[in-house]
């Protein structure tokens, strides 16, 4: 009797902690703004489009850190458009000659 009771308490504790973790993950992601409808006034549509633009910027922003792989860093260095930050050789400088 006590063994089954202990099993049920542990299963209930696990299920509750799993629900808490899933709830925390769901709150961390921004929710899409609600559409005001087709016949909404211009002010409501402007607010909706502003909120939608903010939402899209949040979910598509670039992430740095552990997600940056060495391959992407190398390709960024090789395919860089500006050459002002690339170190030059000593022999390319005319003052050396």
Curated annotation (Swiss-Prot):
The keyword Signal applies. This is Pro-neuropeptide Y. It comes from Gallus gallus (Chicken). One of its GO terms (molecular function) is neuropeptide Y receptor binding. It is found in: Secreted; Cytoplasmic vesicle, Secretory vesicle, Neuronal dense core vesicle. The modification Tyrosine amide is found at residue 64. Residues 1-28 form the signal peptide. Belongs to the NPY family. Keywords: Amidation, Cleavage on pair of basic residues, Cytoplasmic vesicle, Neuropeptide, Secreted, Signal. NPY is implicated in the control of feeding and in secretion of gonadotrophin-release hormone. One of its GO terms (biological process) is feeding behavior. GO terms for cellular component: extracellular space; neuronal dense core vesicle. InterPro entries: Pancreatic_hormone-like, Pancreatic_hormone-like_CS.
């Amino acid at each position: 009797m006590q063994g089954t009771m202990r099993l049920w308490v542990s299963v209930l504790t696990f299920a509750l902690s799993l629900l808490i973790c899933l709830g925390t993950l769901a709150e961390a992601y921004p929710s899409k703004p609600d559409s005001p409808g087709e016949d909404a006034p211009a002010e409501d549509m402007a607010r909706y489009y502003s909120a939608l633009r903010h939402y899209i910027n949040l979910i598509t922003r670039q992430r740095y850190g552990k997600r940056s792989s060495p391959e992407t860093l190398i390709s960024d260095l090789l395919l860089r458009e500006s050459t002002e930050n690339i170190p030059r050789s000593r022999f390319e400088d005319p003052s050396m000659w």
